[in-house]
Design a protein with these regions (language model features):
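Core catalytic lobe of class I
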Residues: 1-231, 238-241
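Catalytic-site neighborhood detector that most strongly recognizes the C-terminal catalytic loop/helix
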Residues: 249
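Short functional hotspots where side chains directly engage DNA or cofactors
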Residues: 242, 246
């Protein structure tokens, strides 16, 4: 079956991805199952880790040579994810959720306020840093050491113009509040739209082709036309797919 852009597909991603042409996707953004929820919980049957070898075979086939693969993770799953493809792993972003989870264990361990976003690619992808406004006291400016063109970390390097700006480059820690469960919160592990919008703006060009899925049996393919084109992906069950379709219709 051919997978078309701007559609939600309910099914196993490993069955659906063969319908995507080779080297046709600019970005893959995925919230994989972490395999951390109680297996006896009948509402968490979707939280089963997808076989990495099979998953990477499809990812590496459909991604463009300079495309990017962004995969959410946490704890030991992040470690396993990084180890699953050491050749393509580059770095991690830290998503600060602004709200802790794990309150039942708060007297035993710190509550968790962040998740990882593992960044993989074959060749250097598009990178549009989303600049951060800065106050006059913390403006991006030179340190008066333009004559020093070597250091212990980078060795010798070329000088660059010294520019005083009202914004600075982003760091690896990005803050987007997760929010609270509301009628618009369609799944307990869904990610904020603004976070996904940030990732799409950072790693794709206008008109880029991205795919996004969440869990083993969810699939979404879309095209980045600008601010309006950000999708919330469907979940395994039919009720979540219907919810996503209703959300997109507005």
């Amino acid at each position: 079956m051919k997978i078309e852009a701007n559609h939600i597909y309910q099914g196993d991603c490993l069955d659906l991805m063969p319908g995507i042409a080779d080297a046709s996707v600019d970005a893959i953004i995925c919230d994989l199952p972490y395999g951390v929820l109680n297996r006896n919980n009948r509402h968490a049957k979707w939280d089963r880790i997808i076989p990495f070898e099979t998953l990477w075979a499809q990812y590496e086939r459909i991604i463009k040579p300079n495309g990017v693969i962004l995969l959410f993770g946490q704890g030991m799953f992040t470690s396993d994810l990084m180890q699953s493809n050491r050749k393509l792993w580059r770095y991690n972003l830290i998503w600060d959720k602004g709200r802790g989870t794990g309150f039942l264990n708060a007297n035993r361990m710190p509550m968790r306020c962040h998740e990882d976003i593992c960044v993989f690619y074959k060749s250097l992808p598009v990178y549009n840093p989303q600049m951060i406004p800065s106050s006059p006291l913390s403006r991006n400016h030179g340190k008066g050491k333009m004559n020093k063109l070597t250091n212990n970390c980078y060795g010798t390097f070329k000088p660059s113009p010294s520019v005083i700006a009202d914004e600075k480059y982003p760091s690896s820690i990005i803050y987007f509040p997760k929010g609270h469960n509301t009628e618009s919160w369609l799944h307990p592990t869904q990610k904020p739209v603004e976070l996904l919008r940030y990732l799409i703006r950072t790693y794709t060009k206008m008109g880029g082709n991205f795919r996004q899925y969440d869990g083993k049996r969810d699939y979404l393919r879309g095209r980045h036309h600008g601010e309006a084109t950000v999708y919330r992906h469907g979940k395994r069950t039919e009720v979540f797919c219907r919810g996503r379709e209703a959300h997109q219709r507005g």
